[in-house]
Amino acid sequence: MMRHLKPYQYLLAATAVSLLMPTFATAQVQELNVQRDTVPTYLKVQNKGIVNNALDVLNGNAAGVNVTSNGMDRMAQLSSVRVRGTTSIVGGNDPLVIIDGVTSDIATLSTIYPADIESFAVLKNAAETALYGSRGASGVIEVKTKRGTGKGFQISYETNIGLEAMSKKLDMLSADEYLATAKRLGVYANNGGYKNNFYDVITRTGFVQNHYLAFSGGSEQSNYRASFGYIDHNTIVKTKDYNNFVAKIDVTQHAFGNRLVGDFGVFGSTYKNNDIFDTQMLFYSAACQNPTYPAGRDANGNWTKNGSAYRINPPSAVLAERSDQKEMYFNTHMRLLYKLAPSLNLSAFGSYSYTSNENSEFCPTWVWAQGNVYRGEFKKQEYLGNVSLDYAHTWGIHSLAAGLSTEYHYQERTAFWTRAKGITTNEFGYDNIGATASRPYGATGSIYEDQSLASVMANASYTLYNKYKLTLTMRGDGSSMVGDNNTWGFFPSVSAEWDVKKEHFLSGFDGISTLKLRTGYGHSGNLGGISAYTTMNNVQQTGIVPVNNTPTVTLGTIRNNNPDLKWETKSTFNIGGEIGLWHNRLMLTAEYYYSKTTDMLYSYDVPVPPFAYDKLLANIGAMSNQGLEIGFSIAPVQTKDIDLNVSMNLSFQKNKLLSLSGNYNGMNMSAANITAIGSIDGAGQNGGDNNHVLYQIVGQPLGVFYLPHCTGLYKDEQGTMKYRIEDFDRNGTIDFGDGGDRRICGQATPKATLGSNISLRYKNFYMSLQMNGAFGHKIFNGTALAYNNMSSFPIYNVMKGAPERNIVDQNVSDYWLERGDYLNFEYLTVGYNVPVKSNIVRSLRVSCSVNNLATITSYSGLTPMINSYVVNSSMGIDDKRCYPTYRTYSIGVSVQF
């Protein structure tokens, strides 16, 4: 049975902790002594042109924050975010998201219309992340949405319309070059009589439109704001579209002489996405299909296939595969704040969230022999409630702020899915699974899980002379997901700040406007690697056997019980400061941090018996991250007619896997020091003794390239070219295994990242240019490895230049390992604020933008902006799955009434 924290257990624990120290209210984070990267989004959204995802606004505007599209599919709205790198192997690395006080996630944030967001605040430091206890180790993104202003009735409307054009595509042999190469090599190539570029066949000019309407009204005592947003995107890949509709209402009411403030909000969104079912098959087929084959069906209604090619299908036929997603999200929340005394506030907050996600897939019989259909539905409900008591008072040279808070979070998830094959007709798609011939064993399932988290929080902040500040925080979390022996965990932090500018010895330095120093140390946790039933013995069906002539399902253990399982703990130290000169027209910030993750989760091989299963998830490993973040901004020109502003953030980050060995209940446990985590495989990978490329190695950054070293090419007896591999161990034999003749030759994660913005205003005209960059990392060009392989020709088409190279070797080596450094011009926007003289129209703005303007890089592939941050099998590997790079041209209009 699922173990819950009962309300009386929660209250008793809260009372016990409260006797020792005051607690802290989550809603009062802003009272802490912390330095946060705050990104106001209004101008960012307006200047960036087409913005389909709220996280696009954050990308490049906060030091140490990296936003990456999931996988290789840039049509998807969902992104992955890393704050100061990776802190766990199997635990969650996406930051916690708090939207107007409501606990959320990256997926939900991606559905919010960007213009609804007033600002992001990224919490990274020790004192900041410790506030969120067992969920703060990967950083926290606080999102503040817009509210009514109480300035009377107002209406605003914004729209952007854009076209997307492919900016770069693979240069494969044309039909004429394909036939000429086959003739020159003396090999037979089937001539279908057509001349096709299949990338052109499956792509189109994309079209995207965004519309946003908001109105607000009321007075300072009672106000409201409502907004509606719609995004419609016809992507550059034919038949693949998505749209998103969002609605949001907020009401604020003051009562009893402003002693009581109530805030009520409702948010809802619906999202539909016609995604690509098999990204690799689609784009690999488009590149490598015989260019003389027809783009559509032949005269008999059949598709022309090459039966000798592995995972190659006519690209237009692959487009008929469907992978559709429908998601609905609803949230309502209420906050009440009552002023008990001039220095004492009592607040209560509650929220309810509901998510429904439907996934449907269909593969027709002309792609898969028996066809394939899938339907699944996933639902989630969340309840959140907290009560806090906050005190703030100043007397003389002293100031004190303190708070108490308790919180309870409950989550429930259900799911059902089924998969079938043996399609009678393709006409039904995925809408009539009953018409299929079979449902494979294990392809139908359902789940139910729930989890709860109880929290107690404390905060005290003391300020002397309004320039020396000391802050102490403590959070205790009790989770139903961890082991019985570790139900509660405690996460303290301490931080200090010195406002040097207010010192007497700087009173004569008028050029210095701001000078602050700060430091902090704290603990935070990570529950991401633990699900609802991870600590228990789990079983699942293993087969069907006859019992008394009745088919009976057999069950087997799939997980060991671990009552000692707990959250990972990250300890962070940071020190930094900021200086502002000449009325802060020149600002410089710098911060160094070091964090160490201990009790890191990892799955270990264990003996059976005494264990019931051969794997055990345990808290044993350790990992470190350290870095330096620098921020710079300058406003060199500020006049009535001209404003020029330049800002930049630069982050240096170093990760290290410290250990995977340790002790569990008196038993020494360890994992392999070298483990492959990413490979070149799938379509087009013909030959090669060991295709592993990316590894986790103890003592190295997580995700390094561990490859044989190629010293050049040599011509074999047949006159073809192969890679000459260095014999590192000098044993006379080239070993492509995971040791011997391999060496560490770079990392997939950038050592440094850059974000920069230049904005210029001349009278009513303005211009904004955003640049992002990443440096110090490598990319394995698996696409070039596969598409330059002449041993697969003419079954597969190849890139131009491949026949001249005549390489027939498919073994991986550092020959195709390239520098991944790049500087990307993210967007350029030029606009005009139209002068208006009207009692109705308050402002009118028109603009034109180009997104993904240009990229400066030495990388030879389509784009260096692949997954370089999320540790998975695709990290740092360009492996034929790349979504086409495209450029967006858009115009925008914003009007306020």
Please name every model-derived segment.
Residues 732-733, 766-827, 862:
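C-terminal beta-barrel architecture of Gram-negative outer-membrane proteins
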Residues 206-209, 244, 250-256, 264-270, ...:
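Extracellular/periplasmic, surface-exposed regions of secreted and cell-surface proteins
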Residues 280-315:
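Acidic, glycine-rich flexible loop segments
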